[in-house]
């Protein structure tokens, strides 16, 4: 089901996504003296610039809209050779299938696009 056919639903999603994405997400260091913003932390750099094609506002808007429409948001963590996360790539929720078994609720994710299936194990943020 898509909100494009309902202008009221689309307007509500627009307000939600915009309102959520306006305040910036920050990384803090907690200490006895108080919380301190760490601007140069790798997680902060990633939150500010999730990937070359998206701003932080666009990524946050995607998360809110996906959760409101589909109940889930999926973000692929692209890693460098050292294992550090260097990009966050949003995945279309309708193309992600959550797999589990009797022992584990979630064992893997499958992303299906254009007839291809990509199995994703640990490199996904599921909201």
Specify the residue positions occupied by each region the protein language model found.
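Structured, contiguous alpha/beta core segments that scaffold functional sites
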Residues: 1-126
